[in-house]
Amino acid sequence: MTARLGARGAVELIRAHDGIVHRCLADFAGREVKHTGDGMMAVFPDSKRGVDCAIRIQREFHHYNQHAQEPIHIRIGLDSGEPIEDSNDLFGTTVQLAARLCAEAEKDQILVSETVAREHGDTFAENLV
């Protein structure tokens, strides 16, 4: 991205991304755990808020991309469970599965674990972008 857009262009794109995601996190009581350079890990008080936030993020980027010179494509992976918190970071199978789902997602796609699908599958069916 930096090679294509230059340092300034890449920073502007990251700021646009982070602005959208941070607004959505705030709306659903989400908390950024860490920025991974090309994405971020977040945690929510409950899985419903995580699902609703993911859908809002997807919609916000869809809207952003309709008017953007440089579109931003996102991938989201969701799992539900109790991660282990240590040194301001999260660990455990929930975190690992969410990361794997994110890595497997196509651009602009939300992939969820079986647990999330079982608990909130209807929410996704009702909110297709």
Write out the residue ranges for each language-model feature.
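Charged helix-capping and loop-helix junction motifs
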Residues: 91-96
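Catalytic strand-loop-helix junctions within cyclic-nucleotide turnover domains
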Residues: 43-48, 77-90, 107
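Active-site phosphate/pyrophosphate- and oxyanion-stabilizing loops and adjacent acidic/basic residues
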Residues: 55, 99-100, 118
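Short, intrinsically disordered, mixed-charge
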Residues: 56-59, 103
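Catalytic NTP-binding/metal-coordinating core of nucleotidyl cyclase/transferase enzymes
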Residues: 1-53, 60
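Residues that scaffold the ATP/ADP-binding catalytic core of kinase and kinase-like folds
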Residues: 1, 43, 86, 119-120
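Helix-adjacent hinge/juxtasegments
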Residues: 49, 58-68, 72-74
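A short beta-strand->alpha-helix segment at the C-terminal rim
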Residues: 64-66, 74-82, 103-129
